[in-house]
Amino acid sequence: MPHNSYPLLHTINDPADLRLVPRAQLGALADELRAYLLHSVAKTGGHLSSNLGTVELTVALHYVFNTPHDRVVWDVGHQTYPHKILTGRRERMATLRQLGGLSGFPQRGESEYDDFGTAHSSTSISAALGMALAAKIRGEERYAIAVIGDGALTAGMAFEALNNAGVADCNLLVILNDNDMSISPPVGALNRHLAKLMSGQFYAAAKNVGKTVLKGAPPLFELAKRLEESAKGMVVPATLFEKFGFNYIGPIDGHDLDALIPTLENIKHLKGPQFLHVVTKKGQGYKLAEADPVAYHGPGKFDPAVGLQAPATSPKQTFTQVFGQWLCDMAAVDPRLVGITPAMREGSGMVEFEQRFPQRFFDVGIAEQHAVTFAAGLACEGLKPVVAIYSTFLQRGYDQLIHDVAIQNLPVVFALDRAGLVGADGATHAGAYDIPFLRCIPNVSVACPADENECRQLLSTAFAQNHPVAVRYPRGAGAGTVVQAGLEALPFGQGEIRRAGSSVAILAFGTLLHPALQVAEKLNVTVVNMRWVKPLDVALLLQVAADHDALVTVEEGAIMGGAGSAVLEALQAAGVLKPVLQLGLRDEFIEHGDPAKLLALQGLDAAGIQASITKRFAALLVPGRLALKAVA
């Protein structure tokens, strides 16, 4: 982008440069930053609405605080593009979320200004508290700041941290970025004046001295306390956060630098835990995003002058769409079905379900632990809960999955979206670990559909069971298999031989069946669609093992403890010795990039699978040699 389009912004290579900008020019700088951000994301795709809403707050934080000496932890982290632009990564924004490029989230290894890696929500206060107390222990004068959205504040972990932080006696600032106006709007000039007053040292000192004096006269102290709360209640929310031990300031307009900067400058000189409530608007400064922040939450490439266009109709359904349609169809015939999502209504494909069955739809917010136990309670009373959740987010409810669902053997269906590689969101969102962490839990079954139609059928199979079942499926579309309209279920715990071939057999778990079939055409090997990791189809496995000289397992999940490990365990238990090649996601965190490229780098595309089999079992791949029993 030409420098003359952003004359101020192009002088900023780090926050030290930002602090040299006259305050009167910061508004113009924020305008340039917002325009640069909009046009940059329009070329790469990425999170937009949330970033447009944090421009002024980001400018103010880096202007007032001495970053990176002072620490800033951004909750969730998808709102950090302005932060990246101001901290030396402006020219790399063209590589955003691409293989080898900038992450869409903060990463400690990417910049010294990324103090803590985030992507899952509600972790910022805990991390910032740790940093603040570390500074206190080491005798270092610095502030630790957590920036958290009102949505992330619905998670229990955030309140656990607030409860701990309020009595920690350290320099911690929690900034509530209220971008849904779900708590309270700002109330004009009076509120701005009050925020400045409440963040001042005189107010803080007077309040503390007054409380100390009045504690000698309890009735007077309680009266003064109630009067203070009542006075604040006229212009600010109830003093919930002061109950945690914080000095509450706000709410103030998060797009008003003349309010933000003086307030932050006052806070910088205060001791102890501070809580600043700022109100921002998602999509701020771009009318189309302001009007529809959900649509512009994470758009692909688009023309800012035109806006998002209606996507071309794809001949392929996504797995998410298949799930959403199945959910509605099953709910129409079974009144026991209830749907639960932890703040992922759109992403999990539940919009139509909410519209058609509003009394049976529950969005519990960013509260995965609660979602799982809530489902358990519903199941106890004879309902059939379906929890639609991304694979990576089920990790956050693992204890509840074991303690509240599995031990009681309750019939909860977990529809695990985004299983396997997720592409641009990177390691934090990869659904790599669900097979290992689910298959080790007694009573829990795990299904891996190979295509869209099988996904629908296995969801029906899962729903028919009287115990917990997880059905894992990837992001995006599959092979383009036509999805049947019925609700027929596949046999529980049974796989199938899809192709008979030579003395090597590929055992495919999930959508990697399709590259396995491509390999089979070239190497003339057998391909088995296993469908279930647990219960494993041991009878089929032992039959295939008896008919072949070697086995290959393929899965889009962590290889350690995964489906391949289940095969090895079953063979060992049966006393069968057979060479087994395990192919899956390696023991490493896989960063962001194009999913197809990432799969190839893991050796899990057709070419990679073929190369691995050829290298390991070349002597067995004799043309024309057949496993006769498999053919029969």
Curated annotation (Swiss-Prot):
GO biological process: 1-deoxy-D-xylulose 5-phosphate biosynthetic process; isopentenyl diphosphate biosynthetic process, methylerythritol 4-phosphate pathway; terpenoid biosynthetic process; thiamine biosynthetic process
CC cofactor: Mg(2+); thiamine diphosphate
Positions with a binding annotation for thiamine diphosphate: H78, A119, H120, S121, G151, A152, N179, Y286, E368
Alphabetical list of InterPro entries matching this protein: Dxylulose-5-P_synthase, THDP-binding, Transketo_C/PFOR_II, Transketolase-like_Pyr-bd, Transketolase_BS, Transketolase_C, Transketolase_CS
Residues that bind Mg(2+): D150, N179
GO terms for MF: 1-deoxy-D-xylulose-5-phosphate synthase activity; magnesium ion binding; thiamine pyrophosphate binding
Associated pathway: Metabolic intermediate biosynthesis; 1-deoxy-D-xylulose 5-phosphate biosynthesis; 1-deoxy-D-xylulose 5-phosphate from D-glyceraldehyde 3-phosphate and pyruvate: step 1/1
UniProt entry tagged with the keyword Nuclease: no
Cofactor note: Binds 1 Mg(2+) ion per subunit. Binds 1 thiamine pyrophosphate per subunit.
Protein EC: 2.2.1.7
EC class (word): transferase
GO cellular component, one term: cytosol
Family recorded in the similarity comment: Belongs to the transketolase family. DXPS subfamily.
Protein name: 1-deoxy-D-xylulose-5-phosphate synthase
Species lineage: Bacteria, Pseudomonadati, Pseudomonadota, Betaproteobacteria, Burkholderiales
